[in-house]
Amino acid sequence: MRWFLVLLLVALVSVEASRRSRLFKKLYQKASNYDAAPSNVQTVWYKNMKLDHFTWGDTRTFDMRVMWNNTFYKPGGPIFFYTGNEGGLESFVTATGMMFDLAPMFNASIIFAEHRFYGQTQPFGNQSYASLANVGYLTSEQALADYAELLTELKRDNNQFKMTFPAATQVISFGGSYGGMLSAWFRQKYPHIVKGAWAGSAPLIYMNGGGVDPGAFDHITSRTYIDNGCNRFILANAWNATLNLSSTDAGRQWLNNNTVFKLDPRTKIRNQTDGWNLNAYLREAIEYMAMVDYPYPTGFLEPLPAWPVTVACGYMNANGTSFSDKDLVKAVANAANIYYNYNRDPNFTYCIDFSICGDQGTGGLGGDELGWPWQECSEIIMAMCASGGSNDVFWNECGKDIYQTLQQGCVSIFKSMGWTPKNWNIDAVKTLYGYDLSGSSNLILTQGHLDPWSGGGYKVDQNNAARGIYVLEIPGSAHHLDLRQPNTCDPNTVTNARFQIIQILKCWVDPNCNTIPTISPLPSISIPNGDCKDVVGGYPWGQTTGATVSNSFILAILASLYAMF
């Protein structure tokens, strides 16, 4: 769910522009060879996918990329279907190891479908983002219809793939971040096609009317750092320190020639506006490390050590409040270097003007970098901002009307296409999918306690649980860690959550399972020590159903005793 992630496409020429650009937090993650989960996928193409599923007057089509692995599939087994999100499929294949780990147990086929307008699935080729008329077909609703058509085709005799799944084949959808949102909505919109959904770190209610505080993301980011030993004063005051230094000749001289970081020659500090640019650059690293605070080395966004927030706090944990401006900036910059330059490349430079260099924090996204901003400027409109003070360690950027500020950002990005506020629907998600789960069933919604995006997810509700809607907030877990390949360094909470989820999946695909599974509270967190290694085919990872039942039994006894007194 990226996150999160910030895609800063507008030059930060003022404080207000900085606020606008930071509103586009992109959930996409870029994988690397650090995240090489076992996959062995084959690429195939769905030919002649409908461009517009909701009219009979438009017969245009495009080709959609699909990756699959049928090594473990046996007739009668389910389809594990990944609802592709805002990026190329490769990232999601390598970062969703649980699907591959479970497939042999379930005799499952693994299918990843690429989201229209992302990766290699470009309906209009290199003109996909050339006009509003073209990019207007980039919607979650159209993408879900793509997935529904693909699965329908796969169950059709003599289909274009020359591989037919029985009509009774159960489909379980998987997804993380925006992909998790799609996975949950897929089950809600197409329950006749999808038996159930595992949606990891999906901010399903972070839109208008969902009841989420706009400051939730940065509140949780700040909590993750403070809980890991960071001195709140250092983080909260470093931003003004940057501005103070950028306001004087001596301060600018130091910022441009210090020994902690090198600035790109094109983006030297010349004024306080450049100081804001530096703040945005440093903050991006702080936020992203909270998202990907994994217990082992990864390369999900950039190459990072295990528990990167803990490592970062090693530079920001000095006691007290008596720090010079230079001390504060050095502390946060050293922390940011863990994200941007963990491999200590001596030639690495901070390019802090995103209009010149793009976003170094999520570089390599390809030619579809306008995709997520378009979706945030049309249907998936998330009001997010830091407010400082007691809420978080950043500056107050909320302003009087967060949506008006967001609109100004949309105009800046899409003005050449003629974007106006008429092109967005602030209530699109509420109208298309809704926030009330009373009519839904068979949803597994996981949230990582460390993950800033968890603030946009559902909370535990016993009424929902009675309908087979499971909400798990997992201590010690960052952005959809539960969907990644199991690892010896995973906290026991993550392992137990996976184990319980698998019992639910078993019921969903078993035609003889007529009882809604229940889940138990997760155990107190314990973090393993030692070498971190992927665990392939390790289910049940030392967990037992009996232990889970026993925990529930103990809780029931305690509740009864409490009632007696």
From Swiss-Prot:
Source organism (scientific name): Caenorhabditis elegans
Enzyme Commission designation: 3.4.-.-
Positions annotated as glycosylated: N69, N107, N126, N240, N244, N257, N271, N319, N347
GO MF annotation list: dipeptidyl-peptidase activity; serine-type exopeptidase activity
Keywords: Glycoprotein, Hydrolase, Protease, Serine protease, Signal
UniProt name for this protein: Putative serine protease pcp-1
Stored InterPro entries: AB_hydrolase_fold (IPR029058), Peptidase_S28 (IPR008758), Ser_carbopepase_S28_SKS (IPR042269)
Family of the protein in this entry: Belongs to the peptidase S28 family.
Signal peptide: 1-17
